[in-house]
Amino acid sequence: MATERTPITPSRRTWLSQAVLAGLGPWLGNPVWASPIEAPTTLLATWQTPDAHHIGLVDVAAKRWRVNRSLAVPTRAHGVMVESSDSVLALARRPGDWLLRWHPRTGETQWHWIGGERRFNGHVVASPQGDTLWTTETDLETAQGRLGVRDSRSLEKTDEWATHGMDPHALMVLPQALGRIPAGSLMVANGGISALPETGRAKHDLGRMDASLVALNPQTGAVLGQWRLVDSYLSIRHFAWDAVSKRVGIALQSENPDGAQRQSAPVLAVWDGEQLLPSVGQPVLQGYGGDICARPGGGFVVSCPRANALALFTPASAWSVNLPHRDTCALVAQGDQWWASGPDGILSVAPHHDNEVALAAAPEERLQFDNHWQIWPLA
């Protein structure tokens, strides 16, 4: 049953009605093969087809993958999150106006549409207790970042805090204390890029970029710390927690107007609770980190779609090796394995042996995966 907590505009109502009439609800069963995949890993993903945008579950085995079930959404999705009840959350890509809870097992949906002078920036996290959600947002009047504090059951906003920067993007709950920042603190990636509504996603005033990593008190929103990189053109985008090295890896995207400097810019920074430092010794990766995950055994993997490569780094942020993979972006890791998206198939990498790579071939129906994945259900 769909739940609408804010007024539905005619365009929203039209889309929901057309989606039902067109059969764009949950896609259950095995649409690609009748026989089951052997011991698959299931990923929560978002993707595009020629005529629709989707979120859904994808089963991945050693040599093939398939869509398990899916749900059409009104615009391109971005961040996804798996809840303890096996339901999932997805948000529209920035500047977005919808937040969705979907129950893949039953097909039940709960929609929340943001209104007024706010837009979603594509990411959400939950409190450890599961009663609160935090969403990164932008104030359309000022372009300043806001953190929406939401009731997890209703998805309604109960409070709002400043992120102390523009263009807040990813956020994470710090798993354990680092330096003077306590466990449970909210880490926010202020991308630092101004993009007001009249310009859509077009960027402006890049010479005044002010990207930062911010730690906030999860109870009050008070600032616990703020860090910046020396290169002001590096936009801070996405996070990964390395439980081995006890560090936070951050995927970067350069906005440097000088083409050569942009192409050679670092795609990773590492925060240890005290310092925020960029990667060292990396080759040219076109200055664009699409997604990031922790590397089993310690370190990080950063997808570099513009370089058609997966860049592997040590926990100290030193570049290690590149794995070629065309137009790769979405990453996810579980246990001793990690996976990466790409139009040629889903790449899976074995533990501690980064040259042991398997490519699960794409089915006949080609999908264009979006930016992020999660493992479903939660372990």
Region roles according to the model:
Residues S70-P74, W113-G116, W161-G165, W227-S232, ...:
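Surface loop/turn motifs at the tips and blade-to-blade linkers of beta-strand repeat domains
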Residues L71-E83, S87-R101, G107-A126:
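Blade-loop segments of beta-propeller domains
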Residues L147-D151, L206-P218, A265-D272:
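Beta-propeller blade signature
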